[in-house]
């Protein structure tokens, strides 16, 4: 969940928790990774990555593109899984890009969750075949774009296959395998 999600939700209780994690993990060190619980490690590394963004996140794309591949894989997979679980593939395509979603598919495969990568590839094919692209950025534009049910089946497939516990377990193994890329290294 990004800091901007709290502006559109009525739940500001989670905002404090989000900001506390941002503060705590913004200076994450790679030596700390093994001690972080499985249920929190993805949040820890995404908070560390997001701490590199400017306050308004205008440089998000540049920062993500500058990261090592293992960091990109985990970040994109986590980000897109939240978009899909929150509002389906329609929301994911409206809020991000085909490239970002494609990177998430590769991220799921890299961490060892290929079925999710396959579901995302199906959604990308549907999106390409339909020729539909999000036009505009208003709430009306979003509602019009998201109103189509082209993604109904892949939305259900993603939610059926995705298991947060499994993703966290696979991601922790992956993060520890590539821990030199996550967090600040001790001198």
Where are these regions (language model features)?
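Membrane-interface interhelical connector segments
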Residues: 2-7
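Extended, alpha-helix-rich binding/interface surfaces that flank or overlap catalytic cores
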Residues: 8-75, 81-86, 90-100, 107-187
